[in-house]
Structure formats: C-alpha cells, structure tokens
C-alpha cells in the first residue's frame, strides 16, 4: 500500500487499553499505537477503504458481545474520524469492504459478521454521510 502500513489488533488487556499496532509491510513494529483509549472492547476486523491513491479510511471493529462499533481512522494521518454502530450486529470477528457500486449500495458496502453466523451489510454512502467523510 501507499504508506507501507500493516495494522494488527492488540487484544491484550492492559492499563493503557486495547489498540491497533502499526507495522511496516516487512513486519517491523513502527512504535505507533492507534486507537488507545477509543476501543471499548477487543480490536478485531480490519479493512482499508481506499478512496484514492493515497486517501481513504482504516476501519477497525471494536468487538462487543452485545453490540459492536466500527471505528474509522484517516488513512494518511491515522487520526480518529468517528464510529458507527449497527442496531443488531455484535460479536464481529471479521469485516469485508466491497467498494463496487451496486443498485442497493451505490458507493459499495461494508460487510460484518454477526455472532459467528450471519452477515450484515452497511452502505458506504450512508456511512460517509453519517461521519461527514470525503468521497470522490
């Protein structure tokens, strides 16, 4: 990728809180820790929403047994830009981002596993509107 980022969820519970650790694509830890103090539960699913050659958003699942939230960070600055929650989806281990336009999802969709058995789809257009994200 453009910034040589490899994101790994750190599920270890510590006084500092759980977070995402950034590595280079060859496996070297950069020292950057993302989302500490923002995650309420375990960091799980990770997806990159690429909106341009060097723009977009990292999406991280904050996995809760009762309800998840999906945290969005700017691809370039790695700054937190907001979160969304589904009304049902919980206990998500994995997410998948499909940026391809369809009739139902004109800007694509974010798919999340619900409780190890079903999938939920979130409209990327609705997410962008809710969080005030810039899309091409």
Per-segment meaning from a language model:
Residues 91-136:
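Blade-level signature of beta-propeller repeat domains, shared across WD40, Kelch, NHL, RCC1
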Residues 1-4, 46-54, 96-108:
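Structural signature of eukaryotic scaffold interfaces centered on beta-propeller domains
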């Amino acid at each position: 990728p453009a910034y040589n980022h490899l994101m790994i969820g750190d599920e270890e519970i510590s006084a500092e809180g759980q977070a995402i650790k950034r590595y280079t694509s060859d496996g070297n830890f950069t020292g950057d820790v993302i989302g500490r103090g923002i995650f309420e539960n375990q960091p799980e699913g990770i997806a990159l929403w690429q909106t341009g050659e060097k723009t977009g958003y990292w999406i991280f699942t904050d996995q809760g047994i009762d309800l998840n939230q999906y945290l969005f960070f700017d691809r370039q600055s790695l700054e937190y830009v907001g979160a969304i929650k589904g009304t049902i989806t919980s206990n998500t281990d994995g997410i998948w981002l499909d940026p391809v336009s369809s009739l139902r999802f004109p800007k694509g969709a974010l798919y999340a596993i619900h409780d190890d058995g079903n999938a939920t789809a979130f409209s990327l257009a609705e997410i962008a509107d809710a969080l005030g994200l810039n899309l091409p």
